Every structure is written in structure tokens, then in C-alpha cells.
From Swiss-Prot:
Entries under PROSITE patterns matching the protein: PROTEIN_KINASE_ATP (PS00107), PROTEIN_KINASE_DOM (PS50011), PROTEIN_KINASE_ST (PS00108)
Domain called Protein kinase: residue spans: 62-330
Highest taxon of the lineage: Eukaryota
InterPro entries linked to this entry: Kinase-like_dom_sf (IPR011009), Prot_kinase_dom (IPR000719), Protein_kinase_ATP_BS (IPR017441), Ser/Thr_kinase_AS (IPR008271)
SUPFAM superfamilies: Protein kinase-like (PK-like)
Annotated family: Belongs to the protein kinase superfamily. Ser/Thr protein kinase family. STKL subfamily.
Organism listed in the record: Mus musculus (Mouse)
One Gene Ontology molecular-function label: protein serine kinase activity
Name of the protein in its database record: Serine/threonine-protein kinase SBK2
Record key words, sorted: ATP-binding, Kinase, Nucleotide-binding, Repeat, Serine/threonine-protein kinase, Transferase
Region (Disordered): 1-26, 329-362
Known EC number: 2.7.11.1
Biased composition (Basic and acidic residues): 1-11
């Protein structure tokens, strides 16, 4: 899955009036000030952490057990402390592709979030070696969520609801610290057990203080909110806000329930699946749902319509899913097939789907 490419910079509070406008998603001066306070706190933590980095080679203190993950910018290893035998996860970032500031930023964001049951706990140990920077976190041993999502099927409904509830709680916690996560996707969700009972959010390299000006420089992905695809309201970019995470959570919940992406890109002019969704959402008529939305329940429709509102200030916050937990998010057995038959017999919708091709699978 390609990541979002972006340029970002801090925003001055004076550039936006209280209340914002449609392009800003209702971001207020108070919210921007909260983001600035978070940014200042991170700067202070980074300055302190830079002075306390342990100067050593990783293998002198820790023994590698096995790889846990590999990304474009680094790798995660399961290690044990050579003296105490304590198992830990070590994220190692090569100096060739990572600046000291970039390393300190990700390290300190994790530290600033403290302890949360659905966020990987960061330990206050940063290491500078000859060729890399590293930091330590709690180990999560069962891989990431993408390996649990069966393409074109998704997760069992109870597991999907558990994951969604835990991730919404994690995002609320991040937002309460004046930050926007910005990179929600299955690859950044670690699974704690084989039954997928507990998950934890990880990787805070894209997390930024609320109000940071963001300009998208690469192609959008399914999780990219549509306001990032539009011309920015300010020359420097769009002031980011928690509604970006709400959109990504809605897309992820859809993937958990169906095993499909709802669209490739949130662009009406290039993606007919996204266009169909907007038409259906505007109609407010569940019976007109496009495929594969027909497998979802009315409660899931309402939940996802709120999280996936194209207007950011009308979009429901991530915590809105609490009202839908315990309700069915999928049609009962037989109902989805019956609705699919009705859609095929109708002909009009089925013809549209055939013309568009296959829905993108997760």
C-alpha cells in the first residue's frame, strides 16, 4: 500500500478566523492553539531526548530474535536485553534515509501519548549508532491487521467491531493531545493475539499537530479524505484536523466488513465507485445501495455515511461509532443475497457495475 506523500508546515493562528469555513472543516482558533501547544511540547521533548540518546551499537545491548516488520524507512525487530532477557520491539531507522530530527519527532510523538490500551507503548530509550537511530517499544507479536483481512470477505463481524472500537478509542486519545494521526491503514495496526481480540496502533511518523498546513504531493489512496484532493484553501495548504482520521476510520471499517476498498481514489472524475457512493449517500435511500455495500446493515450505512461525509465539518468524529457497537453491521444471512438478486433484476445498477469493472479488494 503506497503511503501518502505530503508537505507540511506549522500554521499561524492569525491566518484563520474563529469558526473556519467549509474548506477548513470548522477548525477554530482554540483548536489551532491546541495544536500549537502540542507542537511546542514536542519541540521541548525532542530537545531533551537529543541530549539523552544512548551512543552505542544496538547489538552491544540487545540480541536480535527475529524481524517483526519492514517498511520503506526502516525495520522493526524483536530483541531481548542481553543482561535481563526482557523481550522488546526495536525500531531501527538508517541514517542514510532518516534525519536526527525526523527520528526524534517520531520517537517523541510516541512518548507523548503515554499509555493507552490500543496504542503501542513507547519506552524512553533512544539509541544512536554509527549507521542508524533506534527506539524501543512493547513487542506485539502477531503481525499487522492486513494479514487478517480476507480479500472480498473481511473479518467476522465481532472482530470487526472490536477492532473499530479500539482504534476509535486510540484516535480519540491522539486527538485529545492536539494531534492528528494521518496514517490509519491496516498495515499500521498491530494484532496482539491470533483471534484478533486486541489491536494496537503504531507508527507515528506522519502524525502532526492539529492545524499544521498540509499539501498532498502524491496521488491519493482510498484512505485520503477528499478535502486533501481539492485545491487548498490557503496557498500553503490545508490546516489538518481530526476529521481526516474520521474519514480514514470509515474506509477501514468498510474494509474490515467487506474485504474490499470502497474506491481506489476519492475523486468523482476518475473513480465511478466513489461517484456512486456520493450519489447514494445524497439520496438517503438504503435500497439504492451500490455493490458491495449491499452486504452491510442499515446501522452500518448510517455509521459510515457519518464518518465518510465529504464535507469535513459535517463529518462525524471517530467516537461516533460508540452508538453503533452491539448493533448488526452486516445483513443477516440470506438478506444480502436477496438484495443482490433484487439489484441484478433491476438491471440498471447491475449494468453500471458491469461497466465499471471489479471493486478493488483489500
Amino acid at each position: 500500500m503506497p503511503g501518502k506523500q505530503s508537505e507540511d508546515k506549522p500554521m499561524e493562528v492569525s491566518t484563520v478566523e474563529d469558526g473556519g469555513d467549509e474548506g477548513l472543516g470548522g477548525l477554530t482558533v482554540e483548536e489551532l492553539q491546541q495544536g500549537q501547544e502540542a507542537a511546542l511540547a514536542l519541540e521541548d521533548m525532542m530537545a531533551l531526548s537529543a541530549q539523552t540518546l544512548v551512543q552505542t551499537e544496538v547489538e552491544e545491548l540487545y540480541e536480535e530474535v527475529r524481524p517483526l516488520g519492514q517498511g520503506r524507512f526502516g525495520r522493526v525487530l524483536l530483541v531481548t536485553h542481553r543482561q535481563k532477557g526482557t523481550p522488546l520491539a526495536l525500531k531501527q531507522l538508517p541514517k542514510q534515509s532518516t534525519s536526527l530530527r525526523g527520528f526524534l519527532y517520531e520517537f517523541c510523538v510516541g512518548l507523548s501519548l503515554g499509555t493507552h490500551s490500543a496504542i503501542v507503548t513507547a519506552y524512553g530509550i533512544g539509541i544512536e549508532s554509527a549507521n542508524s537511530y533506534s527506539f524501543l517499544t512493547e513487542p506485539v507479536l502477531h503481525g499487522d491487521l492486513i494479514t487478517f483481512i480476507q480479500p472480498k470477505v473481511g473479518l467476522p463481524q465481532p472482530a470487526a467491531q472490536r477492532c473499530a472500537a479500539q482504534l476509535a478509542s486510540a484516535l480519540e486519545h491522539i486527538h485529545s493531545h492536539g494531534l492528528v494521526y494521518r496514517d490509519l491503514k491496516p498495515e499500521n495496526v498491530l494484532v496482539c493475539d491470533p483471534a484478533c481480540q486486541r489491536v494496537k496502533l503504531t507508527d507515528f511518523g506522519h502524525t502532526r499537530p492539529r492545524g499544521t498546513l498540509l499539501r498532498l504531493t502524491g496521488p491519493p489512496i482510498p484512505y485520503t479524505a477528499p478535502e486533501l484532493c481539492a485545491p487548498p484553501p490557503l496557498p500553503e495548504g490545508l490546516p489538518i484536523q481530526p476529521s481526516l482520521d474520521a474519514w480514514a476510520l470509515g474506509v477501514l471499517i468498510f474494509c474490515l466488513l467487506t474485504g474490499y476498498f470502497p474506491w481506489d481514489q476519492p475523486l468523482v472524475e476518475v473513480d465511478p465507485f466513489f461517484e456512486d457512493f456520493l450519489i447514494w449517500q445524497a439520496s438517503g435511500q438504503p435500497q439504492d445501495r451500490p455493490q458491495p455495500w449491499y452486504s452491510l446493515s442499515p446501522a452500518a450505512d448510517t455509521l459510515l455515511w457519518g464518518l465518510l461525509d465529504p464535507h469535513p465539518r459535517k463529518r462525524n468524529p471517530v467516537g461516533s461509532i460508540k452508538s453503533y457497537l452491539g448493533q448488526p453491521w452486516k445483513q443477516r444471512e440470506g438478506e444480502a443475497e436477496e438484495l443482490a438478486t433484487e439489484l441484478r433484476e433491476d438491471g440498471w445498477r447491475g449494468g453500471q457495475e458491469a461497466a465499471k469493472g471489479e471493486q478493488p479488494a483489500c
